[in-house]
Amino acid sequence: MALWGGRFTQAADQRFKQFNDSLRFDYRLAEQDIVGSVAWSKALVTVGVLTAEEQAQLEEALNVLLEDVRARPQQILESDAEDIHSWVEGKLIDKVGQLGKKLHTGRSRNDQVATDLKLWCKDTVSELLTANRQLQSALVETAQNNQDAVMPGYTHLQRAQPVTFAHWCLAYVEMLARDESRLQDALKRLDVSPLGCGALAGTAYEIDREQLAGWLGFASATRNSLDSVSDRDHVLELLSAAAIGMVHLSRFAEDLIFFNTGEAGFVELSDRVTSGSSLMPQKKNPDALELIRGKCGRVQGALTGMMMTLKGLPLAYNKDMQEDKEGLFDALDTWLDCLHMAALVLDGIQVKRPRCQEAAQQGYANATELADYLVAKGVPFREAHHIVGEAVVEAIRQGKPLEDLPLSELQKFSQVIDEDVYPILSLQSCLDKRAAKGGVSPQQVAQAIAFAQARLG
């Protein structure tokens, strides 16, 4: 059933109808559209459009429809309705007859779809927050179990300084905590209802929009009708949060893909999240992680596309805004799937401590400790930096780690070096000295784990 047509003397071309219709994707707003319609029916009672008995009949029919949709959502796609609003209204009229035609009094699809989408976003943010915190918890648990797994830290993908696998896990906990904060912050701006703003100028009925907002679970009602039907900031905000969150997951995936290579060999992924080759029997490919990394691009594309769609629109509703849903639905679905998959990857990961330790002992990751040792002996840091660089060149020439160079060799570079240098060059000493807040020392890592556990509950 079309919600318009009296103005027209010709039927829509079938090609235009297919081009214009949005039911194939906005069917996902069915539950929100029905819930919003129940609230609107209550508001119509307060202004005398509906009697209490009529409202009760409408609400009962809408609730039956809601249960039917939950049981069989795909039924919606069997219809040729233009959009989800048309479908719900048509089904309602099928159930209650002419009474169903009174429900849209004082309401526009402009404020209706804005309300539906905000309700959907609120529900989806709740799911994302749960999945985000589950992944944080998985990372904290992995950190808890690997506090003694020493491995090389990298800059420029070159071995730099020793860290622990726990410290690496906690870095991603921090990123995910920021993602969580962004979602919680977005909820504050989502929590205002546009219902009752009409097409653009407000409704002609003296509806208490604050009461209406409360019935729908919103904190308040919007303050300007023109802005309310024009606003898609919440779509951009959530796409931006998703884009940033997926960058974090992509980096997480890239790190683990590298750690899982034969060349690094720091971890082994579970068979449950890997696949094989159709040709090479020995292969065990990190497909779950590669897909997380690859899906990052489609989420970035959704954000860019929505920015370009909105940038030139005049105020109030334009049909361009129908393009807000497919990208948003796909981006948030993708982010949610990737959060779940990242947690699954961690569930079966094996950290190969001996190999991590071996790699940490290579690459002169303790060179900074020698420079700090020289500074403690009174050598200016820039000079100490140069001295240690020369010592590293000599160690490389001899094929030895720094700590295996005899004292006589080290003293060729600086006479202040003494026997007390050797304990300082040990990996454990390198870790222990990083005891300032946020550092990699065992004490700091343990405190960070405890803090994260307390925050996550």
Curated annotation (Swiss-Prot):
Where does this chain mainly localize?
Answer: cytoplasm
The record's subcellular location field reads: Cytoplasm
Reactions this protein catalyses: 2-(N(omega)-L-arginino)succinate = fumarate + L-arginine
> Record's PROSITE patterns?
FUMARATE_LYASES (PS00163)
CDD domains recorded: Argininosuccinate_lyase
EC numbers listed for it are 4.3.2.1
- Which pathway is this protein assigned to? Amino-acid biosynthesis; L-arginine biosynthesis; L-arginine from L-ornithine and carbamoyl phosphate: step 3/3
Q: Gene3D superfamilies recorded for this chain?
A: Fumarase/aspartase (C-terminal domain), Fumarase/aspartase (Central domain), Fumarase/aspartase (N-terminal domain)
Alphabetic keyword roster? Amino-acid biosynthesis, Arginine biosynthesis, Cytoplasm, Lyase
Judging by the UniProt lineage, the source's domain of life is Bacteria
Q: Name one GO cellular component term.
A: cytosol
* Alphabetical list of InterPro entries matching this protein: Arg_succ_lyase_C (IPR029419), Argininosuccinate_lyase (IPR009049), Fumarase/histidase_N (IPR024083), Fumarate_lyase_CS (IPR020557), Fumarate_lyase_fam (IPR000362), Fumarate_lyase_N (IPR022761), L-Aspartase-like (IPR008948)
Quote one Gene Ontology molecular function term.
Answer: argininosuccinate lyase activity
Gene Ontology BP, a term: L-arginine biosynthetic process
NCBIfam families linked: argH, PRK12308.1
The text of the family note is:
Belongs to the lyase 1 family. Argininosuccinate lyase subfamily.
List the protein's name: Argininosuccinate lyase
The record lists the organism as Escherichia coli (strain K12)
